[in-house]
Amino acid sequence: TNPEKLVKISNYFNRDGGPTVTKGITVPEAMYDDFKKVCEPLDSINPDFSFELNKRTSKPRPLPKTAGGSDHAYFAMNGVPTISFDNGDPKGYDFNYMEIWHTERDTYNMSIPEYMNHTSVVTAIVMYNLGNLDHLLSREGLYDLNVK
């Protein structure tokens, strides 16, 4: 479980939402400037898919108390940021996540190649640029540690 290592993780990214394309990310204000730098090249890699960086305007979310719901939950309940990419279907393939997800139809051939290719590039650029920051992302404004 290595709790001493969790404080060294900038963010846990979990891609488990169907074969749609990554179109943006929404981050707390304290992370915005870092993500602006990290995401700078993303709008120029494919004119078919824009990338939008947004500041989260909602209050910090409660720190989860249990490790249920998804793969990221254990990290979140231990205070690790678990910000995910925003995804969409701008070309209208009409992928129905709830019809396919975790069923016998949840197979590789349901993937949308142009979405997966673009998302792979976006993910690689963001991971590389985050990994090359000289500091971890701020956790300020992410979790409300006072909610019991």
Predicted regions span which residues?
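Metal-dependent peptidase/peptidase-like ectodomains
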Residues: 1-94
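His/Asp/Glu-rich mid-to-C-terminal helical/loop segments that flank catalytic regions of hydrolases
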Residues: 92-148
